[in-house]
Amino acid sequence: MKHSTKEEREQRIEQLRGEIAEGVEKLRDSDEWKRYLDYVGRFHRYSWNNILLIMHQSHGTASLVAGFSQWKERGRMVRKGEHGMKILGYSSRLVRDEDGNPKTDEDGNPIHKVWYPIVTVFDREADHPNRADTDPIEKVHAKNQANSPAQNAKTILHETAHTLLHQTLPDGEYGKHRGIYETEAESVAYIAAKWAGLDTKQYSISYVNGWSGGSAELIKQTAEHVRQAADTIITALETSRDQ
């Protein structure tokens, strides 16, 4: 198997960054923002930029992704010839001096060198399933199909999102940027409700260009805030469900 050169890897990383930037631009559209929220519900443990990469490379069809080894551990083998999707991983190592001792910063904390290697993930449609294996997402949906829509559930999720994201805002801050903060809370509630199998037709997501002013940086920040809060809530729900 031919290994790529450093220049080829750097070029591919730049291509991925270009895909991320393109994805951010698309999030200005409210329908695309809602599609992003749907993806966060499926891939809440991934960073917002990797969610955009999965959205882009799967053309909106990915339902559950994992690396080659992860699929193998689940008893499922990736089909030969499948190329998968490229996302950005995370790696770090301790920086040492010439004597092998860990280097520290001015506060005495160990210094780590961080880099973001390209990793490949495959959608579940790209594998040969083990018939004994049941998809964890399918288990969740099966367990929650009987849930009926309830306004109090929507309110609880919305207010929980506010607590996670906005509890420490300075006085007067909420009023200045109410559109952003309400969008964050409603987006998180939408993701969690959809994950739980609740009816999400009653959820109203504000016009993105209205609250963002067209700022790509603000859209990125909001996308990550929403993902983090949704991950916290869904992880808590998963833990509670499995106990």
Language model: regions and residue ranges:
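N-terminal accessory/interface modules of nucleic-acid-binding and processing proteins
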Residues: 1-243
